[in-house]
């Protein structure tokens, strides 16, 4: 068979996203490709194509930013790295005509954050990869799952566009704002017995990565009980940063205003042991805050990549929730908790490990998971479903 000429039309037609070769039982060599729409360097004004892989080249790594390399005389840009066989994560490309974003040879953490902040609005998904969505920071990303990546319950089901949720507008007197809320019910059971799950960053799970077909599939498979799901929009990054980190007003408004509104539409159980609060990053912090302060209402906490460093972003001091637990101001006694963090988000992993150590006396009711991934919704989506399965497993015994 004749080898295809690099950069030819037939060569590009043979590419369907990243390619990998096994190096050994644990590692693969992975190559990413991008086609310059302007052609070769003779015609193109593109100076750099930054590659932003969550948990590998992102700002959480505090490492030198990586640019793809052009193959001279072609429209081909490529970049190669090594990844674990069980790795899963999202990535994007950032083509730019500028060559001065990361001018320092070894930029520090603040320079990295600022540089990526400038670049990410220009990010694009991999045109060769059919799996893409809008990431949490608003830019397009694509998915990469290595051959031995852990199974993600329910995400193997076909997308079913006919499955939709009821969308309402919640006008909060306490918070002085309005937002969208999605209400979704599954299964067939006495309405008052249905468990309740509150999902933070609801707009992401409703629109960017819709959970409806996944929840429906897992309920049909009897891995999840029939339930009511409430997805709360964060409004925007400013409201999110104010309302989610340890904000009593937000959770009082949820309990006093939103939940009665939801209950009139889709009745659910008031039992704390049937109620899950789930969130990621600031949302993970917020979920545990709700459980610690209102355990009589929120008995199950699903925290993924929780920002337990808050409010000390540098990570040099303990976060406020850990301080309160150590001082005995709050107690996790009686809660069931899923605590998950990625080994490729160092500061968040350290904060979660410290929290888990503090919670260790009640370890029988804690599910602690370390994921080979970063600060990444592609990882969170599997942990979200597995967490619901684990937290609600006792309900199946109640019914038997």
Where are these regions (language model features)?
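The feature captures the conserved acid-bearing segment of alpha/beta-hydrolase catalytic domains
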Residues: 309-379
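Short beta-strand segments enriched for Tyr within beta-sheet-rich domains
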Residues: 87-95, 183, 194, 250, ...
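Post-His helix in hydrolase/transferase enzymes
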Residues: 379-389
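Cap/lid segment of the alpha/beta-hydrolase catalytic domain
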Residues: 169, 198-266
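Short beta-strand element of the alpha/beta-hydrolase
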Residues: 182-185, 192-203
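Aromatic-rich carbohydrate-binding modules that target alpha-glucans
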Residues: 2, 23-25, 29-86, 96-153
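Active-site nucleophile loop of the alpha/beta-hydrolase fold
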Residues: 202, 234, 302-311, 343
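Primarily recognizes the serine-hydrolase "nucleophile elbow" in alpha/beta-hydrolase
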Residues: 210, 270-324, 330-331
């Amino acid at each position: 068979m004749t080898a295809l000429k690099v950069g030819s039309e037939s060569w590009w037609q043979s590419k369907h996203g990243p390619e990998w070769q096994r190096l050994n039982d644990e590692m693969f060599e992975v190559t990413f490709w991008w086609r310059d729409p302007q052609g070769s360097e003779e015609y193109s004004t593109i100076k750099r194509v930054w590659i932003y892989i969550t948990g590998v080249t992102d700002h959480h790594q505090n490492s030198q930013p990586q640019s793809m390399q052009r193959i001279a005389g072609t429209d081909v840009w490529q970049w190669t790295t090594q990844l674990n066989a069980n790795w899963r994560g999202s990535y994007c490309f950032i083509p730019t005509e500028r060559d001065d974003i990361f001018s320092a040879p070894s930029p520090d953490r603040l320079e990295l954050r600022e540089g990526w902040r400038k670049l990410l609005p220009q990010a694009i998904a991999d045109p060769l990869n059919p799996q893409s969505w809008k990431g949490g920071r608003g830019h397009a990303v694509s998915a990469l799952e290595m051959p031995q990546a852990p199974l993600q319950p329910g995400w193997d089901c076909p997308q079913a566009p006919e499955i939709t949720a009821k969308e309402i507008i919640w006008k909060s007197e306490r918070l002085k704002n309005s937002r969208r809320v999605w209400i979704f019910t599954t299964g067939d059971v006495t309405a008052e017995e249905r468990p309740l799950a509150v999902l933070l960053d609801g707009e992401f799970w409703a629109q960017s990565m819709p959970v409806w077909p996944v929840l429906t599939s897992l309920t049909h498979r009897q891995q999840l009980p029939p339930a009511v799901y409430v997805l709360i929009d964060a409004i925007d990054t400013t409201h999110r940063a104010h309302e989610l980190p340890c904000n009593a007003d937000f959770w009082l408004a949820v309990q006093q205003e939103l939940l009665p509104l939801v209950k009139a539409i889709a009745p659910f159980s008031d039992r704390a042991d049937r109620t899950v609060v789930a969130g990621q990053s600031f949302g993970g912090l917020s979920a545990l805050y709700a459980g610690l302060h209102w355990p009589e209402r929120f008995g199950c906490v699903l925290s993924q990549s929780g920002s337990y460093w808050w409010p000390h972003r540098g990570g040099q001091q303990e976060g406020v929730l850990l301080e309160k637990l150590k001082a005995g101001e709050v107690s996790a006694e009686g809660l069931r908790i899923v605590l998950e963090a990625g080994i490729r988000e160092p500061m968040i992993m350290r904060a979660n490990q410290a929290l888990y150590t503090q919670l260790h006396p009640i370890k029988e009711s804690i599910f602690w998971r370390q994921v080979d991934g970063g600060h990444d919704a592609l990882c969170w989506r599997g942990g979200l479903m597995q967490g619901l399965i684990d937290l609600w497993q006792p309900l199946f015994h109640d019914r038997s």
